[in-house]
């Protein structure tokens, strides 16, 4: 009888890619295993559509893609932003239940487990109904998990965690060797209007799962991983990363060719790459400061600059129609020989290019792992979600990044945004980021971690062995 795992990623590209790549890894490591991935589309994230098409165009044996019915964006337009994604997930539960019901009744298939994204953990009720073991996948790192479990524990003990908001408090958090400043806590955990009680309910349920699979590796987060393992109230931990989509998603191939062609013409280790994720957008005054800082630094650059979502619109915009309207007068002409401003970027291909020597990033966890895999030092510019915590971990805990600023908040996720990072700060940190290995301890450490990341995924490496133990648990 065929063994089948069901994967349930959250409907956002950063969550989806990691789980699909992990499904491919599972299949490659176990010849008697098949995986079915349920994909639900988030109306704001066009990347899900593009990635989904690439999966259907290039099918993987024993990997089945099931597209859940698309939801009407109008159902969510009046909801507060923090409530949109949970609502999208909730509407899919009936469809998920019907499909799982059919799969568990099959005489040719044995469903050995359901692997759900952290945000999909409430699907546990359905798994329990059909006696299917449930496992949790965390697309974020072990440090973030440790903090979230810690805040959930404080909340359950009736401590008002919202008091940490805008405070100078430093927290002693299991999983962090250094005190964690309240200013880097993910805002959704300390905001009474941000759905924090819902988030804590997810981590409470997460404790009931069979195991937690994390996209990280022992050598990157040893302190945080060990802390999670020592907590008897947390299920077994399996670090199996870094899990990355190193082939890209096939979208915008013509644009990618132009960008990579430009990089081919640049000297080795000469370019700083600026890219801030799907929701990483700036107001015009901040764009101008970044431009001035880049120009003053004297370094070659590739800058992925995307516009904010216009009011009344629901989909992400890939590029500006006229860059001259938002950049300083004459900037494009003055920097035409050393820089290129783009919209969408083939991030993995760019980071893997020999011309790229530095990465100014929003510090999403996938981007952080990609920078480590390719050995490219990061200048941290966190904007929303857990990114401030990731930046703190990379800079203070691990010594793998240059800090630009941790107070900036993206206007999409915050109603007030009057903080500006000045050109002088940007210029200084770019120069520090781009120092060569002789003068940069950070660059040396990142190079060492690059090698460790590859060893972790190789035979008998830490993540390789962790996955083998997970198979013993599942099968």
Swiss-Prot record:
EC code: 2.4.1.-
InterPro entries: UDP-glycosyltransf_plant, UDP_glucos_trans, UDP_glycos_trans_CS
Positions contributing to UDP-alpha-D-glucose binding: 278, 344-345, 362-370, 384-387
GO molecular function: UDP-glucosyltransferase activity
Lineage top rank: taxon: Eukaryota
Keywords: Glycosyltransferase, Isoprene biosynthesis, Transferase
GO biological process: terpenoid biosynthetic process
Top EC category: transferase
UniProt pathway annotation: Secondary metabolite biosynthesis; terpenoid biosynthesis
The protein's role, per its UniProt record: Probable component of the triterpene saponins (e.g. ginsenosides) biosynthetic pathway. No detectable activity toward protopanaxatriol (PPT).
Protein name (record): UDP-glucosyltransferase 102
Lineage: Eukaryota, Viridiplantae, Streptophyta, Embryophyta, Tracheophyta
